[in-house]
Curated annotation (Swiss-Prot):
Gene that encodes it: tpl
PROSITE patterns assigned: BETA_ELIM_LYASE
Any GO BP annotation: tyrosine metabolic process
Broad EC category: lyase
Co-factor(s): pyridoxal 5'-phosphate
Protein name: Tyrosine phenol-lyase
Similarity section: Belongs to the beta-eliminating lyase family.
Catalytic reactions on record: L-tyrosine + H2O = phenol + pyruvate + NH4(+)
Protein keywords: Lyase, Pyridoxal phosphate
Length: 467
């Protein structure tokens, strides 16, 4: 007789999110005719859609995450004093504990920090090397008189490359630039982890350490875009053998230790709807930043944020570095990406941290890049299922500030960005099925013509019409 207790080992078939849902928001389901009218009125720009006309909103993970009960409880403890809010000191302590920087200046969001940083460090004629551009970062650098220079590894520009750290800096490219223009014309090296425009790709700890050593040789600062540094820490834990047994919080602190400061949009990793910061180790630079904050953002103890929002961010930072949280967050992105790969749909690989990036060049090869294939694909996905995604290609790349010509990036992508703790596995299934349906009918799609182009960051407000 078989002993009932003697059973063969069973493989775990699935995983579940490390949270449960307390509050829900109804979603509006629209008809195809309603979506056709909405996207036409929006000029085929998903940024110009009304949120009430969107079923699943994958435009961005910026400020769209769900806060926890712990964060909401903190909102009730908001100290709204104009000066010296206790919530600022809680936020400052949380940043110092988990990121390790000495001096903190709060800002209303990440681009507020980018603006202040650019003003205190960049002068006309400077060069800022970095591991791929980001839209707002590069614009602030250019408005201050600087020129961004891409020194990311070549694999980052290849959507099909399986390099595990496509966010790595090419040390030879960086060295060549320093030798060519001189260290005195490089105010800092701009490092992002993860790299948004490359597909949410991470930079390795070993590579950042090597960049740090090179920068020290020449006396150049490193400034981190820490917006998704927690996600980057997760990839280091998963892909660098020396860190496989270390906690995310430990990895994050070492990662930041190789840099001299950071800009931060707290609307991503820190799990809040608004807010950011500029962190610096150099006290003299901090003094300059603090003086400018009063002009552009508000007093140095609130920086454009309410006390309640600073408290929510302080608590969100604490939650963001929990291993269970980040494992599930990146796991949901991977779930969607793997489903699309299984169906043969072209996406950027390896799967990144915050989003799945559809490769519009391979998805819609019949549409030339100057007819905006990624923009067209994003519009079509909305028409198919009410899913809002974001173009990350020629429209986002903008124009050369000297010649006025379009930049033609190697990567022409549509970003399906997953907000943290918001959507279920069923939403991911529906999204995958909608993408598959568009892919099945891809041959009938034609390009777009831009009929309105704003001066700066055109992807936000540009308007298009069908060719």
């Amino acid at each position: 007789m078989t002993d009932a207790k003697q059973t063969s080992p069973r493989r775990r078939r699935s995983w579940a999110e490390p949270y449960k849902i307390k509050v829900v928001e109804p979603l509006k389901i629209t008809t195809r005719a309603e979506r056709e009218q909405a996207i036409a009125q929006a000029g085929y720009n998903t940024f110009l859609l009304r949120s009430e006309d969107v079923y699943i909103d994958l435009l961005t993970d910026s400020g769209t995450s769900a806060m926890s009960d712990y964060q909401w409880a903190g909102m009730m403890l908001g100290d709204e004093a104009y000066a010296g809010s206790k919530n600022f000191y809680n936020l400052e302590a949380s940043i110092q504990k988990y990121y390790g920087y000495r001096h903190i200046v709060p800002t209303h969001q990440g681009r507020g920090a980018e603006n202040i940083l650019s003003q205190i460090l960049i002068k006309p004629g400077d060069y800022i090397p970095g591991n791929m551009y980001f839209t707002t970062t590069r614009l602030h650098q250019e408005l201050a008189g600087g020129t961004f220079v891409d020194v990311i590894i070549d694999e980052a520009h290849d959507a099909q490359s399986l390099h595990p750290f496509k966010g790595n800096v090419d040390l030879q490219k960086l060295t060549d630039l320093i030798e060519r223009v001189g260290a005195e014309r490089i105010p800092y090296i701009s490092v992002a982890g993860t790299v948004n425009m490359a597909g949410g790709q991470p930079i390795s700890m070993a590579n950042l350490r090597a960049v740090h050593q090179l920068a020290q040789t020449y006396g150049i600062r490193i400034i981190l875009d820490a917006t998704r540094a927690v996600e980057n820490a997760h990839f280091i834990q998963q892909r660098e053998e020396d860190y496989s047994s270390q906690a995310i919080a430990t990895i994050l602190r070492e990662f930041c230790s190789y840099t001299d400061g950071c800009t931060m949009s707290g609307k991503k990793d820190a799990l809040v709807n608004i807010g950011g910061w500029l962190a610096l180790n150099d006290y003299n630079l901090y003094e300059e930043a603090r003086n400018l904050i009063v002009i552009y953002e508000g007093l140095h103890t609130y920086g454009g944020m309410a006390g309640r929002d600073m408290e929510a961010m302080a608590r969100g930072i604490e939650e963001s570095v929990q291993d269970d949280h980040i494992r599930a967050r990146v796991g949901q992105v991977e779930y969607l990406g793997q489903k699309l790969l299984d169906w043969g749909i072209p996406i950027v690989v390896p799967i990144g941290g915050h989003a799945i990036y559809l490769d519009a060049k391979r998805f819609l090869p019949q549409i030339p890049q100057d007819q905006f294939p990624a923009q067209r694909l994003a519009a079509e996905l909305y028409l198919e299922a009410g899913i809002r995604a974001m173009e990350r290609g020629i429209v986002s790349a903008g124009r050369n500030k000297e010649t006025g010509d379009n930049y033609y990036p190697e990567l022409e992508l549509v970003r399906l960005t997953i907000p943290r703790r918001v959507y279920t596995q069923a939403h991911m299934d529906l999204t995958a099925e909608a993408v598959e349906e568009v892919y099945h009918n891809r041959d009938r799609l034609r390009g777009l013509k831009m009929i309105y182009e704003p001066k700066y960051l055109r992807f936000f407000q540009a308007r298009f019409e069908l060719q």
